């Protein structure tokens, strides 16, 4: 059986408590991530991560448009929520959470580097015009199944999962390892429904550990 990989989506300081774009309860994902890291390491399975990595003038930032954060608009001809400045390259906010077992992470894939378009997915920018190196890395390592968790459920996790499925990967989502922005109260619930409908299998961490042994 080809190996699996655990993909940790954007477990970065700016998405956790005190960060520029703090996701409610975002910190609670780190313990889940560390348990999954230990689980994967004990089975020889890869651990990888995505990292939002924006230039300071990124077009998704509300500050670049003179609008309030969370204002809807357009960027590169695509619908866009304008965010607080976050995950600026080489800033403290862009770093992976300090309590995350980072030494186990075999590769980190940057996204959102092009200032003209946002990139929620760890595979593509939002216009699907440019790929990150994630898909090539997975194929080079003959990985065809992913365990996905991270931040935020309703944006980067959702679009990463949907792209992975479209690329032909089997995808397992650890629901209690995810937290959402929830601009609308049901956004995360709808995101999980969308992922499931597209073919992802949803597990709690306890269910995953029980069913996978």
Curated annotation (Swiss-Prot):
A GO cellular component entry from the record: cytosol
Database matches in NCBIfam families: PRK11609.1
Domain of life per record: Bacteria
Known function: Catalyzes the deamidation of nicotinamide (NAM) into nicotinate. Likely functions in the cyclical salvage pathway for production of NAD from nicotinamide.
Listed GO MF terms: hydrolase activity, acting on carbon-nitrogen (but not peptide) bonds, in linear amides; metal ion binding; nicotinamidase activity
Residues the record lists as binding Zn(2+): 52, 54, 86
Keyword list, A-Z: Hydrolase, Metal-binding, Pyridine nucleotide biosynthesis, Zinc
Induction comment from the UniProt entry of this chain: Is constitutively expressed in very small amounts in E.coli.
Catalytic site: 10, 111, 156
Recorded family membership: Belongs to the isochorismatase family.
Entry's EC annotation: 3.5.1.19, 3.5.1.-
Enzyme class: hydrolase
Gene: pncA
Biological process (GO), any one: pyridine nucleotide salvage
Catalytic activity, reaction form: nicotinamide + H2O = nicotinate + NH4(+); pyrazinamide + H2O = pyrazine-2-carboxylate + NH4(+)
Pathway(s) annotated for this protein in UniProt: Cofactor biosynthesis; nicotinate biosynthesis; nicotinate from nicotinamide: step 1/1
Protein name as catalogued: Nicotinamidase
Field pH dependence: Optimum pH is 7.2.
PANTHER family found in the cross-reference section: LD05707P (PTHR11080:SF2), PYRAZINAMIDASE/NICOTINAMIDASE (PTHR11080)
CDD domains assigned: nicotinamidase
Organism: Escherichia coli (strain K12)
């Amino acid at each position: 059986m080809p190996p699996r990989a655990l993909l940790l989506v954007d477990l970065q300081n700016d998405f956790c408590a005190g960060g520029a774009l703090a996701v409610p309860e975002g910190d609670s994902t780190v313990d889940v991530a560390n348990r999954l890291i230990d689980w994967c390491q004990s089975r020889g399975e890869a651990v990888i991560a995505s990292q939002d990595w924006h230039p300071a003038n990124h077009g998704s930032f509300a500050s670049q448009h003179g609008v309030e954060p969370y204002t809807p608009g357009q960027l590169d001809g695509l619908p866009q929520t304008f965010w607080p400045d976050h995950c600026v390259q080489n800033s403290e906010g862009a770093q992976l959470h300090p309590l995350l077992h980072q030494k186990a992470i075999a590769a980190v894939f940057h996204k959102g580097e092009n200032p003209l378009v946002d990139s929620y997915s760890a595979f593509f920018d939002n216009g699907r015009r440019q790929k990150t190196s994630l898909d090539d890395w997975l194929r080079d390592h003959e990985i065809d199944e992913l365990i996905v968790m991270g931040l935020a459920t309703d944006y980067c996790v959702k679009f990463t999962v949907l792209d992975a499925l479209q690329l032909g990967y089997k995808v397992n989502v650890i629901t209690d390892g995810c937290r959402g922005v929830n601009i609308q109260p049901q956004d995360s619930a709808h995101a999980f429904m969308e992922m499931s409908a597209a073919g992802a299998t949803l597990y709690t961490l306890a269910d995953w550990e029980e069913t996978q042994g």
